[in-house]
Regions:
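Catalytic core of membrane glycerolipid acyltransferases/transacylases, capturing the structured
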Residues: 1-29, 36
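Non-catalytic C-terminal accessory region of glycerolipid acyltransferases
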Residues: 32-156
Length: 156
């Protein structure tokens, strides 16, 4: 899943589509992208989502930077969330850069987070989704800090 502007260029459209990627409109709750995510998960596929909505370089992942889509999809599909912290990406591809630079990056994988149970109606509790999003934010912050340290990047 990636921002829809990545599909406007034929080369990047081909690249991301060939990897199984699909666009998401970040300006609203993109129901089509959320449903595509649920379908892929139901088929046993992995779906990569960035709950911050864009690249952030720290030092703090603020609560208002987080979007609820990951917690919603995980809970709707009753699929655990596997949080991942990435360190060093700002050196490999600084914001606005056109090319990736050789640079040390570190990926740290955390323990899975359990989705919230569905209501009897089969719906997802909005307050439960928000609580799971906050749990995810806390987990990601710790993983990001660890990944930055391992990549030798000051987290400031």
């Amino acid at each position: 899943m990636g921002k829809d502007s990545l599909w406007k260029n034929p080369a990047s459209d081909w690249f991301f589509s060939s990897l199984g990627g699909f666009p998401i409109n970040r300006d609203s709750a993109d129901r089509e992208a959320l449903n595509t995510s649920l379908e892929l998960l139901a088929e046993g596929e992995a779906v990569v989502m960035f709950p911050e909505g864009t690249r952030r370089h720290g030092p703090t992942i603020e609560p208002d930077h987080m979007r609820d889509g990951v917690a919603y999809v995980a809970s709707r599909g009753q699929i655990p969330i596997v949080p991942v912290g990435i360190g060093g990406s700002e050196r490999a591809m600084p914001s606005g850069a056109k090319y990736i630079r050789p640079s040390k990056m570190v990926v740290v994988v955390g323990p899975p987070l359990t989705p919230i149970p569905l209501k009897e109606s089969g719906r997802v509790s909005r307050s439960g989704v928000r609580a799971l999003t906050e749990d995810l934010r806390v987990s990601l912050q710790g993983l990001f800090d660890d990944a930055q340290r391992r990549a030798g990047v000051p987290n400031s």
